[in-house]
Amino acid sequence: MGSSSCVKFVFVFILCCHVLDVGTAIDTITSSQSIKDTETLTSTDGNFTLGFFTPQNSTNRYVGIWWKSQSTVIWVANRNQPLNDSSGIVTISEDGNLVVLNGHKQVIWSTNVSKTSFNTSSQFSDSGKLVLAETTTGNILWDSFQQPSNTLLPGMKLSINKSTGKKVELTSWESPYNPSVGSFSSSLVQRKNIVELFIFNGTQLYWRSGPWNGGIFTGIAYMSTYLNGFKGGDDGEGNINIYYTVSSELGPLGFLIYMLNSQGRLEEKWWDDEKQEMGLMWASRKSDCDIYAICGSFAICNAQSSPICSCLKGFEPRNKEEWNRQHWTSGCVRNTGLLCERVKDQNTSIDTNEDGFLELQMVKVPDFPERSPVDPDKCRSQCLENCSCVAYSHEEMIGCMSWTGNLLDIQQFSSNGLDLYVRGAYTELEHGMLLLNHFNHSFFELHSLYFRFNFFLHNR
């Protein structure tokens, strides 16, 4: 009986080893413990997995991280160097880096840390961050949050270094089935002390969030500090960053991500536990008004109107034929000169009918603002006294913003946004009910308007 039991034990042990070899999950990668194509690295909570996957309509193999299932891949290592078979291995190299090897033991991807210890290991944190650390000290040498793919996770920071310009940014997939680096990227940009989130198509600006006020991006219509939970700012080490958190009490239901898709749309997704898939909550592009500067300069875009583009009051289309064909990118030009310009050009005295401001409510303010830390009254007077100032806006957390060039990428919202004051000639501002100047002289319905006129006469 003893001999029979021993044989049974050996048989079961060999069988278990075989099963583990074809589909085992480990929690740490070391130089002696690698993962092959059929194996995975799993976070302690079981939510995140590192392993090999093949996208739909593809035969290539990639090493990636996914949430719950391979339908939600959030990070890819060898994006531009796919494997063409199942011979790949993820291991720690002799120099201490985490690497992906092909069947010929050639390195096709590496963490590429220049100064490493020979005693390193790689594992997950429960936030989904893959780290490479010194085994003895725990000192982190590299982590996947510093080199994201197309997905922003809770706790992951998008950042830009003010001195070097180095960015932590998202880059889209080439297509829904090809994780190689695509045409679109999303990153923070700081210009004249104003921080915004941009999406680029190559080097061309495709979408912008509006100025960051320390809690929200003011150009995202339905963003709120309470709902979105974004934080960030200057970290004291020369970096500007933003990140968000979700409550751990919500469990999987609280898992929320931002994913930049292959068409350049930044999507907010949350985990639908019932459907066992990610559901869409918000997207950066809902209409053509979300495309950067689609209406050109000195125009406003309203997705609820037809046509969507209109010249601001006091302006007319630069090219009327193009405007009639709904080609708006040439924008609008002022149809009546400003008083301050006439005074400056003719060296005459100012008359009683001075320039004023048209107030546009609940809008995404234009690109290229200049910032100054003054109160609303001073903000207005500064702009009025500067003939080059064409508009201003004041936001409690940002302060005074002013514009001296073309007004680009103004968008009308039905809620939130900021109030923008556009400089206009007195003769244009005195007709209080004419809010926008369509080329065909049509009007929006009153319920869709969020503008009013205020006249701010300069006190002499």
Where are these regions (language model features)?
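Beta-rich ligand-binding surfaces for carbohydrates and other polyanions
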Residues: G2-R460
